């Protein structure tokens, strides 16, 4: 009987261990059996049961049991039995390394506050009317009128249709406002001021801002600024927009139309056919570009419907730049014929005129072909292509000459003041006072440390702190002072009265109008007279003419007097240079000519 009981116990033990062994086996469990639940101990994973449960009810029953509560059991759901068994074997330790996502760079905080709706309505009014002065005033006070720094996109001016400033200006035909907006949002200094970061940061943002302005459709009919300009027949705006390589000319609105398809739809003028022709030419026309390497002087002509995607905007950092552009032409064949003529014509002129030979030849060919012509002028400080035969191009030149004139006047005034202040430019042998006379040391010593030309052999940097004895201006007094020094109090008082800072100038003669009965003596020494002055001559490079002046004059001389009269400084420049003969102007050397540089050094 005992033997039977032992055999029975062994059989039961084998059955029990086989059952538990199947649960602990590493044999893969069918994935179709999930999801499953497991109960585990929060305190010790080794004490966790290795049972898998099919439902929440089953696992919750164990967790709430006395055994589960004793081990502080919790349950967890898994998608497959394999995941559950891995958890029981390894706990929460990851089986594969997790990749840490890169930390996004912190967005800079603009030093400018946001623009409210009332301010934006005022801005919208100036854009619509083309009020450049007030437009620039607002943008200068807060660049966020133009840029939404939150997403590096164009600021929304009208919330309903989500118009940016280009939408509004294009619809109103404000070409100058559009050109100024595009100039500002591509200006690195403007963006650095807006974001408060560096050039590398804003260069990347500039791309997104420019694309947002040019190619963002409105919320109504999905029209871009180019759609608006084309639809309302604003040919000037169309040209400005298509000149930018970032403009996508193929975008379609909700009606499935491109900007070219919309040409003149809302235009009601009698010259509608001509306007549509010009719009077609601006959007679909072909251009001939002159590429120039300023270092080697090599040139290349290319034909394209769009300007080069990227080129340097600074003449100092340029590699290969676009120096000139002719067109647009209706067909690619016309453009290539023009390029062929440009390549073969005027070989002698191109060879002898390194700076503007190609441009001079192309300018003549463009006039003969009645094609638009634009070229760069490096002295303006940028690589922008300009048509000096247009009001926009002449406006840029006028602004440059105005600033140049101001600089010349300022330098002239500074030079005049410096000359008046400096005793050493008057040929006067003044004597530096030795203040030892106040201490009874060397009572009458006046050091004469002057060089033969009247300059002090000591440090000239401290001229502002040197006092001079102006008795030298009165020969009798000076001779008496040296031969018969007098240290009395009265003599010292007279000496101090004669002390002068800077140059020992004699008293100026009374003004001519001082005897007038209407002269106001109450102003005394605070009264100043401004004599009439002749502005110093203005040339584009410096205070002497150079070859650039002759090149510029040749272009300006072909412009109608009626147009150029709108720009007084430019008109004055042309009139003055026109008084010289062509032979005289042709002798002006290039600005970087060694002979010219050497002559300027001698001066």
From Swiss-Prot:
A cellular component annotation (GO) from this entry: nuclear envelope
Compartment annotation: Nucleus membrane
TM segment ranges: 2-22
Subunit architecture: Interacts with baf-1. Interacts with protein phosphatase 2A (PP2A) components.
PANTHER family for this protein: ANKYRIN REPEAT AND LEM DOMAIN-CONTAINING PROTEIN 2
Family label: Belongs to the ANKLE2 family.
Function according to Swiss-Prot or TrEMBL: Involved in mitotic nuclear envelope reassembly by promoting dephosphorylation of baf-1 during mitotic exit. Coordinates the control of baf-1 dephosphorylation by inhibiting VRK1 kinase and promoting dephosphorylation of baf-1 by protein phosphatase 2A (PP2A), thereby facilitating nuclear envelope assembly. It is unclear whether it acts as a real PP2A regulatory subunit or whether it is involved in recruitment of the PP2A complex.
Start-end of Acidic residues biased regions: 456-465
Keyword list, A-Z: ANK repeat, Cell cycle, Cell division, Membrane, Mitosis, Nucleus, Repeat, Transmembrane, Transmembrane helix
GO molecular function annotations of the record: protein kinase inhibitor activity; protein phosphatase 2A binding
Location of region: Disordered: 446-465, 505-538
SUPFAM superfamilies: Ankyrin repeat
UniProt membrane topology term: Single-pass membrane protein
InterPro entries: ANKLE2_3rd (IPR056237), Ankyrin_rpt (IPR002110), Ankyrin_rpt-contain_sf (IPR036770)
GO biological process: cell division; mitotic nuclear membrane reassembly; negative regulation of phosphorylation
ANK repeat boundaries on the chain: 161-190, 221-250
Protein name: Ankyrin repeat and LEM domain-containing protein 2 homolog
């Amino acid at each position: 009987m005992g033997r039977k009981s032992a055999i029975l116990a062994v059989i039961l033990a084998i059955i029990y261990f086989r059952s538990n062994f199947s649960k602990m086996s590493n044999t893969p469990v069918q994935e179709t059996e999930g999801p499953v639940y497991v109960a585990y101990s929060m305190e010790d994973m080794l004490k966790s049961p290795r049972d898998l449960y099919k439902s929440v009810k089953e696992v919750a029953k164990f967790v709430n049991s006395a055994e589960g509560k004793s081990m502080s059991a919790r349950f967890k759901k898994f998608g497959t039995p394999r995941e559950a068994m891995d958890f029981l074997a390894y706990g929460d330790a990851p089986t594969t390394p997790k990749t840490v996502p890169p930390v996004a760079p912190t967005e800079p905080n603009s030093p400018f506050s946001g623009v409210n709706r009332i301010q934006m309505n005022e801005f919208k009014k100036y854009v619509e009317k083309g009020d450049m002065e007030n437009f620039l005033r607002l943008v200068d006070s807060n660049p966020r009128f133009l840029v939404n720094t939150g997403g590096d996109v164009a600021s929304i001016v009208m919330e309903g249709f989500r118009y940016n400033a280009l939408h509004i200006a294009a619809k109103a035909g404000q070409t100058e406002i559009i050109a100024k907006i595009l100039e500002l949002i591509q200006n690195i200094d403007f963006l650095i001021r807006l974001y408060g970061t560096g050039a590398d940061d804003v260069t990347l943002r500039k791309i997104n801002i420019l694309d947002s302005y040019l190619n963002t459709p409105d919320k109504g009919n999905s029209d871009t600024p180019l759609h608006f300009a084309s639809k309302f027949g604003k040919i000037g705006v169309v040209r400005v927009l298509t000149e930018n390589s970032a403009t996508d000319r193929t975008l379609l609105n909700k009606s499935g139309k491109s900007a070219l398809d919309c040409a003149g739809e809302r235009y009601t003028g009698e010259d509608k056919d001509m306007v549509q022709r010009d719009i077609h030419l601006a959007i679909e026309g072909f251009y001939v570009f002159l590429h120039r390497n300023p270092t080697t002087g090599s040139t290349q002509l290319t034909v394209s419907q769009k300007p080069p995607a990227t080129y340097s905007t600074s003449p100092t950092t340029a590699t290969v730049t676009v120096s000139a552009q002719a067109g647009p032409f209706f067909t690619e064949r016309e453009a290539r014929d023009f390029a062929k003529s440009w390549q073969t014509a005027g070989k002698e002129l191109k060879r002898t005129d390194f700076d503007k030979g190609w441009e001079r030849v192309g300018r003549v060919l463009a006039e003969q072909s009645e094609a638009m012509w634009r070229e760069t002028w490096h002295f303006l400080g940028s690589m922008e292509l300009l048509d000096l035969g247009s009001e926009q191009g002449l406006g840029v030149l006028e602004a440059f000459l105005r600033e140049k004139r101001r600089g010349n006047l300022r330098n002239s005034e500074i030079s005049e003041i410096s000359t008046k202040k400096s005793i050493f430019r008057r040929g006067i042998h003044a004597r530096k006072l030795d203040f030892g006379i106040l201490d009874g040391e060397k009572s009458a010593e006046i050091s004469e440390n002057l060089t033969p030309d009247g300059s002090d052999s000591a440090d000239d940097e401290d001229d502002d702190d040197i006092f001079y004895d102006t008795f030298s201006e009165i020969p009798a007094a000076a001779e008496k002072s040296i031969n018969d020094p007098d240290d009395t109090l009265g003599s010292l008082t007279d000496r101090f009265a004669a002390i002068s800072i800077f140059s020992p100038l004699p008293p100026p003669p009374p003004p001519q109008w001082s005897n007038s009965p209407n002269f106001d003596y109450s102003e005394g020494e605070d009264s100043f007279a401004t004599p009439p002055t002749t502005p110093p001559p203005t040339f584009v490079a410096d205070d002497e003419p150079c070859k650039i002046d002759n090149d510029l004059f040749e272009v300006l001389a072909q412009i109608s007097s009626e147009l150029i009269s709108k720009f007084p400084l430019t008109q004055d420049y042309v009139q003055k240079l026109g008084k010289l003969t062509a032979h005289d102007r042709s002798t002006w050397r290039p600005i970087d000519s060694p002979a010219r540089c050497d002559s300027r050094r001698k001066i």
